[in-house]
């Protein structure tokens, strides 16, 4: 009986130790336990995925703008970027790759590939509106990234050799697209993501290098910071 008692105590102590160890591992993940289960999800294309960060033509998520944001935020930042995605493909992924992550914050950075592929602006707008509708539950903070400036858009036409296009008309349509989405929905616009990046820290004509993605992350963070600070989500 004495031996059985010693054995039983050992089992109990072992179980207690395992419970504490499991709790420690669960909490020791760079997040604060009070926020466990909520995330930031970055839905996007190659600019979110980290295309060209370290090697031109290849994706390196460890040097993407979501990875750099993670250094500043105390809840997980999920990179839901896939190179080449249009808004149609992004919309298709919302349920499986955004809502499934229980996001508190969603950053939508889509539209560049629609622009390159000359997808009708009305289609792009409808897709972005449907993405917002799916994501918006009344509690989530939603950010919409404007992927261009007028000057950059003009340069992109040159990069892709586009000549049979009314440049100013298409830029005006995209400006109206973003303005209307922001005015009609509870979303915050992120502009000037290319500040300090475009033409300086680039791996190819349209993608940043690692340093460029870090600067881009800082540009995005500057817009997120008031909300993050107000909700105690900063590291």
Question: What name fits each language-model region?
Answer:
Residues 2-13:
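Bacterial N-terminal signal peptides that target proteins for export
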Residues 4, 18-37, 233-235:
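Bacterial Sec-dependent N-terminal signal peptides
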Residues 23, 78, 143:
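Conserved Rossmann-like nucleotide-binding pocket used by diverse enzymes
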Residues 28-83, 93-102:
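Serine-esterase "nucleophile elbow" of acetyl-processing enzymes
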Residues 48-49, 84, 114, 149:
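Active-site micro-motifs of SAM-dependent methyltransferase domains
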Residues 51-52, 88, 117:
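Short N-terminal helix/helix-N-cap motif within the alpha/beta-hydrolase-1
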Residues 82-87, 166-168:
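Short, flexible loop segments at the rims of nucleotide/cofactor-binding pockets, characterized by
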């Amino acid at each position: 009986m004495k031996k059985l008692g010693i054995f039983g105590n050992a089992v109990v102590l072992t179980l207690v130790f395992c419970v504490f160890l499991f709790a420690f591992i669960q909490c020791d993940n760079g997040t604060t336990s009070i926020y466990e289960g909520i995330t930031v999800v970055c839905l996007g294309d190659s600019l979110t995925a980290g295309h060209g960060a370290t090697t031109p033509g290849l994706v390196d998520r460890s040097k993407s703008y979501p990875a750099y944001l993670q250094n500043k935020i105390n809840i997980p930042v999920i990179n839901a970027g896939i190179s080449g995605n249009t808004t149609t493909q992004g919309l298709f992924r919302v349920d499986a790759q955004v809502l499934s992550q229980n996001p508190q914050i969603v950053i939508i950075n889509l539209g560049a590939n629609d622009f390159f592929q000359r997808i009708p602006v009305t289609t792009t707008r409808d897709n972005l509106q449907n993405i917002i509708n799916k994501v918006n539950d009344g509690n989530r903070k939603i950010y919409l990234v404007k992927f261009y400036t007028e000057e950059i858009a003009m340069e992109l036409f040159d990069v892709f050799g586009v000549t049979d296009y009314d440049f100013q008309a298409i830029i005006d349509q995209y400006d109206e697209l973003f303005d209307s989405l922001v005015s009609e929905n509870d979303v915050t616009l992120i502009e000037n993501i290319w500040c300090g990046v475009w033409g300086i820290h680039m791996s190819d004509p349209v993608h940043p290098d690692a340093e460029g993605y870090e600067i881009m992350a800082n540009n995005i963070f500057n817009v997120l910071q008031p909300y993050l600070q107000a909700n105690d989500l900063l590291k």
